[in-house]
Amino acid sequence: MDQYDTTKMIQEIDEFSSKVIAFNSNVYTKITPEAEKSFKKKSVIDIDCLTTEKQIELMKLSIKHKHPKYSFIELSNKFSVDLSCDDNMFLKLAVNYNDEEVLKYLIDSGIDVTVENNFAVKLQSGIIHNNRIIDLLINNGADITVDNYFPYRYAASEQNKEALKILFSYNPNVDSTMLLASINPSEIGAPILDFLISLNADVNINNGAILRENNQYYPVVKSLLAAGADVSYLSTKHLVKIIRSHNKRIIDIYIKFGVDFSKINDIAIEEKDQEYVDTLINWGIEPRVLACLFSSKLSKYRK
């Protein structure tokens, strides 16, 4: 199997994540701190004296923060504001804050959920709560194959297993190995890994990158080895790191799956270090005590 361009895939995810972070700022949403503070205090607002700009701001706040007196739909009916204003900010906020009621209202009012290259479904695929919104977006035209199945890749990178299940229910033919390659190897979680393995993802993708980057994380290592991860991708340096983890459980499972830790005996030791160790041993210090001293794991010193 050809290698996936993991670097490019991860870069695309990182760029979108940065966009999401910016989206969550008041600078992007054009909500003033003063207005938000007042709204969160459940203050009474004279809505009959608001400029159009302030009407829009109030409607945004009604999505971001619930208010007993001002619902988005009621405000929309009163103000007659263009629901696609500010680059469809109402749609984006409804998705970001999992407001299913507002999203349905926007769709019924003619808002296109595919705007900005299907930004809405891309965003929702990374949000853990209320994944019914994904169904709502898809059933109203959202394209889950956009940008080389980006919603799948983003859901995987955000550890959103429930979103992945929904996405696969619509298109089960996506190569799960592509999703595995799109995650930063050092950030993958066991639940997502197990789910992708259940879809026959190749755990040795990109020369065993996932095992190499997670060689001390037991849940991931256990899943990888059980799924057939090739331990030959582990270098001597990896074995040294595993030993230095002082985790007997993880060493035991590696041994169970055929890892030969004796390979570290081939490490080239500098002459001055060898002389130092030999001197200590010649003076009667046992090698096992030296090992504990050098690893800072000798818990008790006895006189």
Curated annotation (Swiss-Prot):
Q: Which cysteines are joined by disulfide bonds?
A: none
- Please report the residue spans annotated as repeat (ANK): 86-115, 117-146, 147-176, 200-233
Q: Which PROSITE patterns match?
A: ANK_REP_REGION, ANK_REPEAT
Keywords annotated in UniProt: ANK repeat, Repeat
Q: Which domain of life is it from?
A: Viruses
- Check the record and name the InterPro entries matching this protein: Ankyrin_rpt, Ankyrin_rpt-contain_sf
Where is the chain membrane-spanning?
Answer: none
Task: Note the SUPFAM superfamilies from the entry.
Answer: Ankyrin repeat
Could you identify this protein by its name?
Putative ankyrin repeat protein R601
Species of origin reads: Acanthamoeba polyphaga mimivirus (APMV)
